[in-house]
Amino acid sequence: MNSDTVSTATAPIAIEDSFRTRVSTRTARVGVIGMGYVGLPLALLFSEQHFRVTGFDIDPRKIETLRAGGSYIYRIPHTDIEAARGRGFSATGDYAHIGEMDAVIICVPTPLSESREPDLTAICQTAQALAPNIREGQLIVLESTSYPGTTEEVLVPILEKGSALKAARGSGRADGHFYVAFSPEREDPGNDTVARRDIPKVIGGLNTTAAEFAAELYGSIFNQTVRVSTPAAAEMTKLLENIYRCVNIALVNELKLLAIRMGIDIWEVIEAAKTKPFGFHAFYPGPGLGGHCIPVDPFYLAWKARQFDFQTHFIELAGEVNASMPYHVVASLIDALNQRKKTLNGARVLVLGVAYKKDVDDLRESPSLTVIELLRNQGADVRYHDPFFPHIGRGRKYNLQMDRASLDRLDQYDCVLIITDHSDYDYAKIVKDSQLIVDTRNATKGITSEKIVRC
């Protein structure tokens, strides 16, 4: 478009029409920042719908792998990457290419600090790198989970300060503006029962035009979009979803501890309760929460609530219950060893499964890492096995530096501790070959043996 031949009054409308046309004709360029467990699947989904997609990441290893047609995520085969490359998908670490995009979607990590406060470093650094390269009429969408207000209070000021542009507010029809929305990711790794396209996409725009742009863009790859009034409402929606899960998991974890004292099988109780066709949704106990959302998100809201002189007692209590579960696991293991006249100090323990949930290659916030650290600190000789991880290196909290052990000679271990119930494990054989099993996931359901301690 030649700006010399377009009046100031009509330029924004022309930009809006151009964006809509480029989306509808699949000529829009889409940039996705963060080629991880959220960003890469999203980029591939856009590519499958024949958008021209560029993936951005600061990790050169990811860029090299993608450029070579490879995949570093278990559930994404290399053939999907190769097919995307055939449709024009590219990967880069150079933010100078941001200006070529019609829409830029930010999918970067938002962990907690050691003091359980929001760590928005990745969002801030991304925004600072993005700002000098954005252009008028672009749509910028944040997908990273954070507290209500992050989009407007953190992202937008950095983008405005680092560029000569302003985020469109109000009617949004003015020169020199870009458009901003928040749309929370809803990835559920390892869940193949719901197609990604069938997961409704929640959208909150900074103004009506931004919301419309985002709805049109996401509506081209998702079967349903759900618009809410503001980015903060969309941010709160994501937190509600995950806090709902966190609180209910904490409830069933606490009930499990009570059931153990009462000599009741909590797993049997849950299976019976879920036969009720209304008013009950089954949640299951475990060794603790893991992943990039459920253990983290409640504390984002709790932190923000304090700015409003509000204490989220219920949420924080649920977080404390879930955070205590690795300690319960270790205590149960110690008791099981003591019953066999053994001590944890010097015991050989094999941790079976270290991913945060079954059948995924993701270690983030996994309770297994805390359990391993606790066992080591009490003198246990700890090994692990997980089909997805040949090595555990330095993480955000722990530097375990362990290589995967073999499943041969399980009888050499004083205890096999089941933390993650991967589907590929032959649990009957594992029980048969082991001296003692401590099962935190009910993975040995249906197997009767005095070797098994369920906790």
Positions of PLM-derived features:
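Structural/interface elements that position substrates and couple domains in central-metabolism enzymes
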Residues: 2-455
